[in-house]
Amino acid sequence: MQGKIIKGIAGFCYVDVAESGIYECKAKGIFRKEKKKPLVGDNVEIEVLDEKEKTGNLIQILPRKNELIRPAAANVDQALVIFAVRQPDPNYQLLDRFLITMEQQEIPSIICFNKKDLAEQEELDQMYQIYISCGYQVLLTSAEQEEGISQIRKILEGKTTVVAGPSGVGKSSLTNLLQEEVSMETGEISKKLKRGRHTTRHAQLLTVGEHTYLMDTPGFSSLFVERMEKEELRFHYPEFVEYEGKCRFQGCVHVHEPECAVKQAVEEGKIHRQRYENYVSFYEELKEQEKRRY
């Protein structure tokens, strides 16, 4: 029987088998021997021990499409990054940091600016324009007024989505609205998942529709690009791609070099200055990390 791990805790994996519900499974010793750790999001094969009690053994981890390090998760289709338009004001450097991390892992990102009811249309248009011009999908929502929820639901359908964003942006409100239509068979599932005194510091997938899962990411603000060379950073800015190879110097990193096509595009307003300034700041940060390494 196949399913997806939606939570792992204290040696148990909770596996969602679409038609049959959630099974509490123990990972067999062979995984420890092979040093293969089951992750939330893993598609797995289980053997059922007790159908009534919904218990079983994990017998195989199916091949992974991808694997995130922080949070530890597998088979992520996309990321939904949520910031508020106001209260708190968006931290664009933090947003760009997250986008780079996802670009590095080839996971497409959708940007959601929540609390749109707190800003004027002109300001919303500016925010929208910055990231649309880089090729990202951008949503403007209001959890308070339940605006844009059906649009998010459509984008999430049939996918496993990592949800990220700093605190206070309305992440929980949006997640609750998305879960509203799913009864969650509340009693049994939540009883099974809440066994033991554990908080949600553990990665967990929330079911928001058939084969549709959301994963919250704790520790968002401490995020940074791990294991990246400074020369690699430019490849994680989609808006730089069309200028690659058009600079005077081969291997131009678009920081101090003369006759740089990217810097020229910034001057001409084709690349947003704020995005470029964040790029330079990250480049210098990686340069410092490199110095400390050697």
Language-model features, listed with the residues they occupy:
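Structural detector for short beta-strands of small beta-barrel domains
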Residues: 1-9
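Helix-rich effector regions associated with P-loop NTPase G domains
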Residues: 11, 29, 35-52, 62-78, ...
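SH3/SH3-like beta-barrel fold
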Residues: 13-17, 25, 46
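Short, structured beta-strand/loop micro-motifs enriched in basic residues and often containing a Trp
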Residues: 21-30
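Short, Lys/Arg- and Gly-enriched loop/turn segments at beta-strand edges
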Residues: 51-61, 89-91
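Phosphate-binding glycine-rich loops and their immediate beta-loop-alpha structural context
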Residues: 86-135
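Canonical P-loop GTPase G-domain recognition
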Residues: 117-169
